[in-house]
């Protein structure tokens, strides 16, 4: 039996538009982002996808993307589970900074390493910083010292995988069709795990906003196929635009 999983990166956020490092900062969608969410829902509807359960992060840009997509699908009633483990990678001291200005200051290669390498985190945010998640009450039940002040993709994967194994994978194994609406790097982490690609290969992977990525999995959740819904060239262009965000102007 083929299991279906869709990974959907949130639509354009205000800080995507402003070309700023966002991380765990709770920035909302732009009007374009809301349109992308609806368009993603239409693509999934045209594909004939009937979901059984959905998962998202605790950040509004992902939550609102999921809501917009489900409305277009006419599946607003779907059970939705939110977890901080699906949050974007924490960008530490880079959060809020302009990506192009940071590239001009530190060099495009260094910014590419911070953005796209597997195991090198950006400079950390101190736990005493008001922007640290330890001061945000949505994480009040968690150990403040266990919350990240920065993350690499490797540590993001370590954070995401327990939720995959404990919450998402059992639903897929039970034959459920699953939608995960999250963020560029939490989804890159899942992509790496599912496709078992190398640390070097993940450096070149960019996930565009608002375009559903459909996986077909076997009974053991091994990948049989995967593809972006809609126009493949449009998805390619959107991914290239993501890659160019870290370049100096």
UniProtKB/Swiss-Prot annotation:
Keyword annotations from UniProtKB, A to Z: Gluconeogenesis, Glycolysis, Isomerase
One MF annotation (Gene Ontology) recorded for this entry: phosphoglycerate mutase activity
Annotated catalysed reactions: (2R)-2-phosphoglycerate = (2R)-3-phosphoglycerate
Pathway where this protein functions: Carbohydrate degradation; glycolysis; pyruvate from D-glyceraldehyde 3-phosphate: step 3/5
Major enzyme class: isomerase
Signal peptide extent: none
Pfam family membership, one: His_Phos_1
EC number from the UniProt entry: 5.4.2.11
GO BP, one annotated term: gluconeogenesis
SMART domains: PGAM
Superkingdom of origin: Bacteria
UniProt cross-references to NCBIfam families, sorted A to Z: pgm_1, PRK14115.1
PANTHER family for this protein: PHOSPHOGLYCERATE MUTASE
Subunit description: Homodimer.
Similarity-based family: Belongs to the phosphoglycerate mutase family. BPG-dependent PGAM subfamily.
Function: Catalyzes the interconversion of 2-phosphoglycerate and 3-phosphoglycerate.
Name assigned to this protein: 2,3-bisphosphoglycerate-dependent phosphoglycerate mutase
Species in which this protein is naturally found: Xanthomonas campestris pv. campestris (strain B100)
């Amino acid at each position: 039996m083929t299991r279906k999983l869709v990974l959907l990166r949130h639509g354009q956020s205000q800080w995507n538009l402003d070309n700023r490092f966002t991380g765990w900062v709770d920035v909302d969608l732009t009007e374009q982002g809301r349109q992308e969410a609806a368009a993603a829902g239409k693509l999934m509807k045209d594909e004939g996808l009937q979901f059984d359960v959905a998962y998202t992060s605790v950040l509004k840009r992902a939550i609102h993307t999921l809501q917009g997509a489900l409305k277009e699908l006419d599946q607003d009633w779907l059970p939705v589970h939110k977890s901080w483990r699906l949050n974007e990678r924490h960008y530490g001291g880079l959060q809020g900074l302009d990506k192009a200005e940071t590239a001009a200051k530190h060099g495009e290669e260094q910014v590419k390493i911070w953005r796209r390498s597997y195991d090198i985190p950006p400079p950390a945010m101190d736990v005493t910083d008001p922007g640290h998640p330890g001061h945000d009450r949505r994480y009040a039940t968690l150990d403040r010292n266990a919350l990240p002040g920065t993350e690499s993709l490797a540590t993001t994967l370590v954070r995401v995988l327990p939720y995959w194994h404990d919450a998402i994978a059992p639903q897929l194994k039970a034959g459920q069709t699953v939608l995960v609406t999250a963020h560029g790097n939490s989804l890159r982490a899942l992509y790496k795990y599912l496709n078992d690609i190398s640390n070097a290969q993940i450096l070149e992977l960019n996930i565009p906003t608002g375009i559903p990525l459909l996986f077909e999995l076997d009974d053991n959740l091994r990948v049989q196929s995967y593809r972006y819904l809609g126009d493949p060239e449009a998805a390619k262009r959107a991914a290239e635009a993501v890659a160019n965000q870290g370049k100096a102007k």
